[in-house]
């Protein structure tokens, strides 16, 4: 499934560290995304592809207790997110009671410094969204709450800059009878493919008006304003590369120039053309994804005849990055992050 050399190489691989990186390392990483700094990019690129896992097994962390991961388990998750922006966890001893499971998920997230939950309209009082087929109510008609395929995207691509989603957790309570597979790609791998093809493609996607999501009227009558911003940007709070993207053809407006159109086409080709570093996973009960808002999609699924046994995935979106140092469970946008970086 994946092509990199699984052996890490000295100085290059040392750019990838678990937990909170030092300011110097953060600076080295942000320098790598400067189109004028080719040496820094080449060093980072070598480290990334050398350290990148070759298959799903390299992403998996087994947990004994979802609510209380051990220091070693926590470290293993941070290491995988440090290298691939993603970890797959497996906890077969978790709670079966829905309320307890939701409490355990919050505790698990907090153990990894994920505390600032997005204030999503479909979330419960605890900030967790139940992704399941909804035939009525405010969720009806939205693709995530159907059994239809969900195209490639990053979470919260329609949010404004003050509510940018930096991380999310998907936890499987019940799988579908058939289908419901996720495909996942680290945005940094997409960045590498684009920049290696032509740095001008990256420049186009870093333009502050590269992608516009038009205004939308929510089911409760509230109007979500237009979101205009880049596809790739350096997050000023973390100095890490972040991405906002959707492969949808409706309700998305690309900047009207040849470079942006070419970049959008090439990016879609990466996602649909057999990229070897795309991971595919069909979560089983007790398994989940924890990531720094990676690109992902979902195949169509069938629940079978018993609706109460249908696919149920709990989703938590965070304004924090995995392993970040924020504190306090906030749901309001940060006024200091009210604009997209230029």
Predicted regions and their residues:
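Long, mid-chain structured domain cores
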Residues: 82, 86-127
């Amino acid at each position: 499934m994946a092509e990199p050399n699984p052996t890490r190489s000295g100085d290059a691989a040392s750019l990838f560290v678990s937990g909170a990186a030092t300011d110097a390392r953060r600076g080295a990483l942000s320098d790598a995304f400067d189109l004028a700094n080719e040496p820094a990019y080449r060093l980072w690129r070598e480290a990334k592809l050398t350290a990148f896992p070759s298959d799903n097994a390299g992403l998996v962390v087994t947990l004994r207790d979802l609510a209380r991961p051990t220091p070693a388990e926590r470290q293993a998750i941070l290491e995988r997110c440090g290298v691939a922006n993603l970890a797959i966890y497996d906890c077969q001893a978790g709670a079966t009671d829905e309320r307890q499971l939701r409490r355990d998920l919050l505790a698990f997230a907090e153990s990894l410094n994920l505390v600032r939950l997005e204030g999503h309209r479909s979330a419960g009082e605890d900030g967790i969204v139940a992704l399941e087929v909804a035939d009525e109510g405010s969720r009806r008609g939205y693709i995530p709450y159907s059994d239809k395929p969900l195209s490639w995207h990053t979470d919260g691509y329609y949010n404004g800059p003050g509510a940018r989603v930096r991380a999310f957790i998907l936890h499987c309570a019940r799988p579908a009878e058939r289908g419901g597979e996720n495909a996942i790609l680290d945005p940094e791998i997409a960045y590498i493919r684009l920049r290696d093809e032509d740095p001008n493609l990256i420049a186009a996607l870093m333009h502050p008006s590269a992608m516009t999501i038009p205004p939308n009227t929510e089911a409760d009558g509230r109007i979500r304003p237009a979101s205009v911003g880049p596809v790739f940007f350096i997050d000023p709070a973390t100095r890490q590369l972040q991405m906002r993207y959707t492969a949808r053809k409706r309700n998305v407006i690309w900047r009207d120039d040849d470079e942006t159109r070419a970049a959008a086409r090439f990016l879609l080709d990466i996602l649909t053309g057999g990229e070897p570093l795309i991971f595919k996973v069909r979560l089983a009960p007790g398994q989940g994804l924890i990531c720094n808002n990676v690109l992902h999609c979902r195949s169509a699924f069938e629940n079978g005849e018993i609706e109460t046994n249908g696919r149920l995935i709990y989703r938590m979106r965070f304004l924090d990055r995995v392993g970040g140092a924020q504190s306090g469970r906030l749901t309001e946008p940060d006024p200091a992050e009210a604009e997209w970086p230029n």
